[in-house]
């Protein structure tokens, strides 16, 4: 990964609550695991509107949602938050007609971002004032927030990038389809919704490590929690063995690797 490349997340939780709070925490753990040391955590598309994306009254977030979620991100070492979509607008017509009933650069029609804090007509949403206030508070304390680090317990969460590279597989291979289904099930599954959540509810703070790369984590006397599947690269298994041999403790949740 190039040192000039800065990765960022898309965060759309539609309300941070008990049911999904572990998702936000693990997003940052996994991003931290693959980022270079000089790359702070960032969210380039951070949900900040009303969540009524089809303008039918189908969503309405609490006025405090963007503020609260942003504070939790910053507390977990996130250093850049791009409120998205902050200002609505209009999608231009395509020069070459598509004859699809829309003929615009986006599928949303002419008006875009009608759920944003500032809608296409410039009208302010009920979410605007709270976002403005929280942003000003953050900027006023920027020098302190930029230097702070989350205090963590001696617990790590392992991340295997290959487990998530399942967007495409050869459609004619039943074997590959079964493999993708297996990885999709065990790479997150109940491990996110039970074990990771229980760690957080019991006040454990933890970071993420990339198991496909050597790192200082292999020398730590820590507890490493890993959502595992039948499939696991030999290099990953060897690193885990070295971690345990060096005094670390390994907790596998899911399946014991067999290939």
Predicted regions and their residues:
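Extended hydrophobic/aromatic segments used for targeting, binding, or gating
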Residues: 5-9, 27-29, 33
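Aromatic- and acid-rich polysaccharide-binding/catalytic face
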Residues: 2-22, 48-49, 225
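Carbohydrate-binding surfaces of carbohydrate-active enzymes
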Residues: 25, 33-55, 59-259
